[in-house]
Regions:
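Gram-negative/organellar outer-membrane beta-barrel architecture
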Residues: 6-8, 17, 22-216, 285-299, ...
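C-terminal outer-membrane beta-barrel translocator/porin domains of Gram-negative envelope proteins
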Residues: 68, 73, 200-324
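Short glycine-rich beta-strand segments
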Residues: 133-135, 177-179, 227-235, 270-274, ...
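Short, glycine/charged-rich beta-strand-loop motifs at protein surfaces that mediate ligand recognition
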Residues: 146, 304-307, 341-347
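Secondary-structure transition into beta-strands, especially the periplasmic turns and strand N-termini
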Residues: 166-168, 259-261, 326-328
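C-terminal hydrophobic structural anchor segments
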Residues: 319-353
Length: 391
C-alpha cells in the first residue's frame, strides 16, 4: 500500500481479501478494488503492477480532505423549500476523529445537528450526536387535516457502529429525547391524544444490509433493515409502569427484467409493543420518503400527507419502473397496508390500498419528479412535485 495510514493496512487487507506473497486472478483484483473504493475510507484508490513480469501489485490511495463544506437546496409541493448546510472536520490524530455540523431550514422542519465520531478504524466508530429540531406538523386522517402541532425536539445519542462486514452495518446505543409542545390544535372533536412536554430514555439496535448500486434509481441489489427500540423515562420504566418498545422491518429488492425495466418489490412494517404508549412514537404512514417528518414514518403511495395508524402496521408494495431516453423514468406503484392495535389480530385489521403514476428525471441536482396518486384513504386525486435530493 502507498499513501495509506499504516494503522489502516491490516483491515484494508482483511476486507479486500488480499494476502501478501500470494497470487490472485484478475477477477479477484477487480473485486478487491471495488471493496476498497466502496469502503469510502480514501478519496481515490488505484493500482499498478511492477516487476520484470509485472508480478508485484502496488495499491495507491489518496487521503480525503481534512474538511469539507456542502450545500443542498430542494423544493416540493408540500414544504415548498428546504436548505441544508453541512460542514465536517477530520482530525487525523492517533485516534481518528470526525466532527460534523448539519443545519437545515425549511417550511416545516428546521434543525441543527452536531456529530462527533471516534474511529477505531474507518468502519468502526464510537458516535456522539446532538440535534435540536423545530417542527410544524400537520396530521391527517383519510385526507382531512385533524390537527396541527408545533414543537421543539432535543435529541442526544451515544452509539457504536460497525460496518466492517461488506455491505452490512450494525449500530446500537442509548438515546435521550425531549419533546416540548408549543401548541396542539385540533379540528372539531378530534382531541384523542393527550400530549405534554416529556423526556424519554431509550436503548436501540439496528442492522442494515444493502447492496444497491445507487441511492436513487438502483438497477440491482437488495436492502434489508431491522431495528428495535426500548423506551423508558428513567432507564427501567415508563410513567411508573412497564416500558414500551418498537420493532421495525424493511425489505426492498430490485429485479432487473431488462436493461431498462425493473420491478422493485417491498415489504415493510412496524409494531409497537406494550400498553403504555407515548404519542411521539406512534406509527405514522404517508408520503414518498421514509422518515420524512418523524423517524418512524413509513411511505405509502396514495397518501401524500402523514397519518397516524394503529400499533401494528404492515405494507406490501410493488414498484414497476421503466427507464426511457437516458435518465428519464416512468414509475407505476401499487401498495397495500393493513393495521390493527393488536399484532396477533393484524389480519383482521383495517385495509388500505393505494397507487401512483409518476415521471422522474435523474439530474445532477437530484431527482426531479411529478407524481399523481390516489387511495381509499381520500376521495380526490393527489399530486406531488419534487425537485432535488431528499433531506
Amino acid at each position: 500500500f502507498v499513501g495509506t495510514d499504516p494503522r489502516d493496512e491490516k483491515w484494508l487487507m482483511k476486507i479486500s481479501g488480499l494476502r501478501e506473497n500470494s497470487r490472485i486472478t484478475l477477477h479477484e483484483l477487480h473485486h478487491a478494488m471495488s471493496v476498497l473504493i466502496g469502503s469510502n475510507a480514501y478519496s481515490n484508490v488505484d493500482y499498478m503492477l511492477t516487476g520484470e513480469q509485472q508480478q508485484n501489485l502496488v495499491l495507491t490511495a489518496q487521503k480525503k480532505s481534512v474538511s469539507s463544506v456542502n450545500l443542498g437546496v430542494r423544493f416540493d409541493s408540500e414544504e415548498v423549500i428546504g436548505v441544508l448546510v453541512n460542514a465536517t472536520f477530520d482530525h487525523r490524530a492517533r485516534n481518528h476523529s470526525k466532527l460534523g455540523f448539519t443545519g437545515r431550514v425549511g417550511g416545516k422542519t428546521s434543525f441543527a445537528r452536531l456529530d462527533y465520531a471516534i474511529e477505531r478504524n474507518p468502519l468502526r466508530n464510537l458516535n456522539l450526536a446532538y440535534q435540536f429540531t423545530y417542527q410544524d406538523l400537520d396530521i391527517y386522517k383519510k385526507g382531512d387535516k385533524t390537527f396541527n402541532t408545533s414543537y421543539t425536539h432535543h435529541f442526544a445519542e451515544f452509539g457504536y457502529s460497525d460496518m466492517n462486514w461488506l455491505n452490512f452495518k450494525f449500530k446500537l446505543g442509548l438515546r435521550y429525547e425531549y419533546y416540548d409542545y408549543n401548541f396542539f390544535l385540533y379540528t372539531g372533536d378530534n382531541n384523542q391524544y393527550e400530549v405534554k412536554p416529556e423526556g424519554f430514555i431509550s436503548y436501540f439496535a439496528m442492522a442494515h444490509l444493502e447492496t444497491f448500486d445507487k441511492r436513487y434509481f438502483p438497477t440491482k441489489g437488495v436492502s434489508l433493515k431491522a431495528d428495535y427500540s426500548f423506551y423508558t423515562d428513567n432507564f427501567v420504566s415508563y410513567n411508573g409502569h412497564a416500558p414500551f418498545s418498537a420493532v421495525g422491518l424493511n425489505f426492498t429488492s430490485v429485479i432487473p427484467v431488462t436493461s431498462h425495466f425493473s420491478i422493485l418489490p417491498s415489504l415493510y412494517g412496524r409494531v409497537l409493543i406494550g400498553g403504555n404508549l407515548a404519542y411521539p412514537f406512534l406509527n405514522a404512514v404517508g408520503g414518498e420518503v421514509e422518515g420524512r417528518y418523524v423517524p418512524q414514518q413509513l411511505p405509502f403511495a396514495g397518501i401524500n400527507r402523514m397519518e397516524i395508524f394503529d400499533n401494528s402496521v404492515a405494507v406490501a408494495r410493488l414498484h414497476f419502473r421503466q427507464r426511457i431516453a437516458g435518465n428519464n423514468y416512468i414509475s407505476l406503484i401499487g401498495n397495500y397496508a393493513i393495521h390493527h392495535d393488536d399484532f396477533f389480530h393484524l389480519l383482521k385489521g383495517k385495509n388500505v390500498w393505494g397507487g401512483s403514476l409518476g415521471y422522474a428525471y435523474n439530474s445532477i441536482a437530484g431527482p426531479l419528479s411529478a407524481t399523481f396518486s390516489m387511495s381509499n384513504q381520500n376521495t380526490s386525486l393527489q399530486f406531488y412535485l419534487n425537485l432535488g435530493f431528499s433531506f
